[in-house]
């Protein structure tokens, strides 16, 4: 395994928050940090007429998150236990295929903008939950996940050279606390896919050897081969900015897509969607397969027709792959509406849509 890259990118471990530098090219990039290349006056006028779409699935997820967070803040531990048990038993999904049990735990996470006292207050609730339910796998996983998030909060997002010894010590200490909770709860009779989710995040932060990380991934997918977050986490760890070499994550994505009992091409597409912000021109700068991605997108659209995000992602990725016909099909479905979570800049949406319709870049 490659040495850790100076811990300079630790802040992006949990979610894909930043994009690559935009490159001047005649093909699309997923980055929205700069201006939109080659846009003309007509496209700017078209962009001004666009409407922000509201994804009903995202609304559903937000409502679920708010309710679970309210239960946590009100210390309704019995209700939390009942909800988590039901989500595990039913393997319930939102209408975009995301797992409700994962969002259950995400609901308790604090924001980086919140003061330290808010984190300490949350820690106290977690401890009360464990005291009230000492044999609960749910309470243990929630606390471990809290420690992982608290570690990144304490450390900050700067380069290693900007992190004080005290901050780095606190970071390592909290990751170790997360690992201790995970070890303690590992043999609990009830299992939860989020246990491996948190364990993999901890392992990445601690820089586990490849063989240990791979063993953990194998355990995770053996327990629940359709819990797509595990395969995404492994692919993410194989980015060149982490522990991989060029082509590593792409090879893993194909392996995950071919796994018996898994999600097939859908898994490949989910990995590409998750990593696109890190790879600039996805289908020019990497070995990612557009045919396999497109196959997965088609599966996602068939299974989850209510998700506007999937259509927006398909439109964006088709443009990046210069598949004009498929891009046009997706943009035609979207009309004059766009999802800001996929297209932060309406000008980019208008520019890409115009290319799909006319072939003019």
Predicted regions and their residues:
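Bacterial N-terminal signal peptides that target proteins for export
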Residues: 1-9
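Bacterial signal peptide processing site
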Residues: 20-23
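Extended alpha-helical scaffolding segments
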Residues: 303-344
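N-terminal mature-domain "stem" immediately C-terminal to a signal peptide or N-terminal signal-anchor/transmembrane
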Residues: 28-94
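Short coil/linker segments at helix-helix boundaries
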Residues: 71, 78-135, 145-262, 267-296, ...
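Active-site cores of enzymes that catalyze phosphoryl transfer or operate on phosphate-rich substrates
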Residues: 138-142, 150, 315
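Bacterial N-terminal signal peptides
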Residues: 8-16
């Amino acid at each position: 395994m490659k040495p850790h890259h100076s811990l300079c990118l630790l802040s992006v471990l949990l979610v894909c928050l930043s994009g690559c530098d935009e490159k001047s090219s005649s093909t699309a990039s997923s980055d929205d940090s700069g201006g939109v290349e080659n846009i003309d006056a007509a496209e700017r006028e078209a962009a001004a007429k666009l409407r922000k779409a509201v994804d009903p699935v995202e609304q559903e997820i937000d409502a679920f998150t708010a309710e679970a967070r309210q239960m946590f803040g009100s210390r309704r531990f019995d209700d939390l236990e009942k909800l988590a048990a039901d989500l595990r038993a039913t393997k319930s999904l939102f209408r975009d295929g995301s797992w409700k049990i994962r969002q259950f735990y995400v609901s308790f996470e604090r924001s980086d903008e919140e003061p330290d006292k808010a984190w300490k207050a949350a820690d106290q609730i977690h401890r009360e939950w464990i005291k009230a339910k000492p044999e609960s796998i749910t309470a243990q996983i929630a606390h471990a996940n809290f420690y992982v998030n608290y570690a990144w909060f304490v450390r900050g997002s700067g380069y290693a050279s900007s992190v004080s010894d005290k901050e780095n010590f606190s970071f390592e200490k909290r990751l170790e606390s997360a690992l201790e909770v995970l070890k303690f709860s590992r043999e609990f009779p009830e299992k939860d896919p989020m246990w491996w989710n948190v364990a993999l995040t901890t392992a990445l932060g601690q820089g586990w050897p490849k063989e240990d990380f791979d063993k953990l991934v194998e355990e995770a997918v053996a327990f629940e081969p359709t819990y797509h977050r595990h395969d995404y986490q492994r692919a993410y760890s194989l980015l060149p900015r982490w522990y991989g070499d060029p082509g590593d994550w792409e090879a893993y994505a194909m392996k995950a897509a071919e796994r018996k009992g898994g999600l097939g091409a859908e898994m490949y597409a989910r990995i590409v969607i998750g990593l696109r912000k890190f790879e600039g021109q996805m289908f020019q700068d990497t070995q990612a397969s557009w045919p396999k991605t497109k196959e997965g997108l088609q599966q996602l659209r068939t299974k989850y027709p209510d998700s506007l995000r999937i259509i927006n992602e398909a439109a964006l990725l088709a443009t990046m792959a210069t598949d004009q016909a498929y891009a046009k099909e997706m943009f035609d479905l979207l009309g004059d509406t766009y999802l800001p979570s996929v297209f932060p800049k309406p000008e980019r949406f208008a520019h890409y849509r115009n290319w799909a319709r006319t072939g003019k870049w």
